[in-house]
Amino acid sequence: MLVIHRRIAPQALWAAELLLNFEARSKSRLRCFSADGEDVGLFLERGQPPLHDGEFLQAEDGRVVRVCARPEQLLHVTCSNAFELTRAAYHLGNRHVALQVGDGWLRLLDDYVLKAMLEQLGAQTETIEAPFQPEHGAYGGGHHHSRHGDEDFNYPPKLHQFGVRL
């Protein structure tokens, strides 16, 4: 098994390629196969952005591995003007949809419910096969509800008694 722990800078040569869809590129722990069929175990640092097309990894045995975004079924969204495209992006963002943004277009994983919503908003949609590389997000840490890092603001609860004070 090819065991990988490290992301590395771009390289001129590589020994293996991983063809991964967006969901697989988002995982820090993954068992998969190289393009040549070799068993691969990814054990990357948690909390990092998803792997992107063209990124390089280094295996424990020193081999360099190139990540390739596998084409997947996407909705390619266009609108007749910038206002409508911005409105479509707003509604998709409000639903926390992973979104790839281009010059005059949006792309998201194919979903019939979102397609109907977009068409109701006046957008034109087309189903395509292409690699998916959505925006990572403005805050980089992902969406969570943990209280990690709130130690300085961890006050004991108070019992409030409402009514007449004597």
Curated annotation (Swiss-Prot):
Q: Does the keyword Cytoplasm apply?
A: yes
Q: Which GO terms describe its molecular function?
A: nickel cation binding; unfolded protein binding
- Where in or outside the cell? Cytoplasm
Q: Which GO terms describe its biological process?
A: protein folding; protein-containing complex assembly; urea metabolic process
Pfam families hit by this protein: UreE_C, UreE_N
Keyword field: Chaperone, Cytoplasm, Nickel
What does the sequence similarity comment in the record state about its family? Belongs to the UreE family.
Question: What is the annotated role of this protein in its UniProt record?
Answer: Involved in urease metallocenter assembly. Binds nickel. Probably functions as a nickel donor during metallocenter assembly.
Q: What is this protein called?
A: Urease accessory protein UreE
What species is given as this protein's source? Pseudomonas fluorescens (strain SBW25)
